[in-house]
């Protein structure tokens, strides 16, 4: 059986309440200079290295000008009025080192188109690779649906509560009981598992087509039934420090995990050898001892 690696796929929401902006995130991911028209701040990441490819993919009804990164994300910033607005969804995924740059790009395009763009989301992705063995992709996705006229639609709408006969329920104040519901299913909790499983499936398909035996699985080692301790995610700051030879706390944790996994592998190998020896001994013909 080919080795199966756990692929860590963080999925998060870019929120204004956390001091973040979609424009700043897009500038950093793409290594460009963008000005956020909502707060007037300019974010210049043109000196950032390791940006292999950046691209915007648009769904039906999206205005052609949204192919411009500044226009797209400033449009998002302007439509979201609240200080605690959710601005974008971000997905990060490691790219197989066994694939060429063109194969990695084809993988990302197919995954993004089928899972997000065809569902109505605008996608802005950037592939990062500094040549240190950690190629990965950042995928930013819009959260609002687009109307047929190219304008942003509503994220949610008012829906009336109904009784068993399908009739509206009075609220006792001259109105009707109601609740808010999303206009799309993009926020369904089950999507996290679906999107992660899809990434693993698309990746394995491309690896197989390229004649590579390696496989990936979006499930944790525990869910796979594999006795292996997963490493912790370093994050950009710790990664940069480690690359410069500066040892970090997270780096130390990962080094200890690697040592523990090596020891665990050795112990399992010894147990396997002991099991086989005991099985062989049990199968040997028994000789009677003379009294």
Predicted regions and their residues:
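N-terminal nicking endonuclease/strand-transfer module with a His-rich metal-binding environment
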Residues: 1-291
């Amino acid at each position: 059986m080919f080795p199966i690696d756990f692929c860590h796929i963080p999925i998060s929401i870019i929120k204004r309440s956390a001091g973040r902006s979609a424009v700043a995130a897009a500038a950093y991911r793409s290594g460009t200079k963008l000005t956020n028209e909502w707060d007037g701040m300019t974010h210049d990441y043109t000196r950032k290295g390791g940006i292999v490819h950046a691209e915007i993919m648009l769904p039906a009804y999206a205005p052609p000008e949204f192919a411009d990164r500044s226009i797209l994300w400033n449009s998002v910033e302007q439509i979201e009025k609240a200080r605690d607005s959710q601005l974008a969804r971000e997905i990060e995924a490691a790219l197989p080192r066994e694939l060429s740059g063109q194969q990695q790009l084809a993988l990302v395009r197919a995954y993004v188109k089928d899972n997000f763009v065809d569902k109505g989301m605008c996608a802005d992705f950037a592939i990062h690779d500094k040549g240190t063995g950690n190629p990965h992709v950042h995928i930013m996705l819009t959260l609002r649906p687009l109307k047929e006229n190219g304008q942003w639609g509503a994220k949610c709408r008012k829906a009336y509560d109904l009784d068993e006969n399908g009739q509206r329920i009075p609220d006792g104040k001259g109105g009707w009981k109601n609740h808010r519901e999303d206009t799309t299913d993009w926020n369904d909790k089950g999507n996290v598992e679906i999107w992660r499983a899809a990434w693993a499936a698309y990746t394995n398909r491309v690896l197989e087509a390229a004649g590579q035996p390696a496989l990936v699985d979006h499930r944790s080692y525990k869910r796979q039934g594999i006795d292996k301790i997963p490493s912790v995610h370093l994050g950009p700051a710790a990664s940069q420090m480690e690359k410069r030879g500066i040892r970090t706390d997270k780096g130390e944790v990962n080094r200890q995990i690697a040592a523990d996994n090596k020891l665990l592998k050795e112990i399992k190998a010894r147990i396997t050898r002991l099991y086989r020896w005991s099985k062989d001994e049990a199968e040997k013909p028994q000789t009677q001892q003379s009294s």
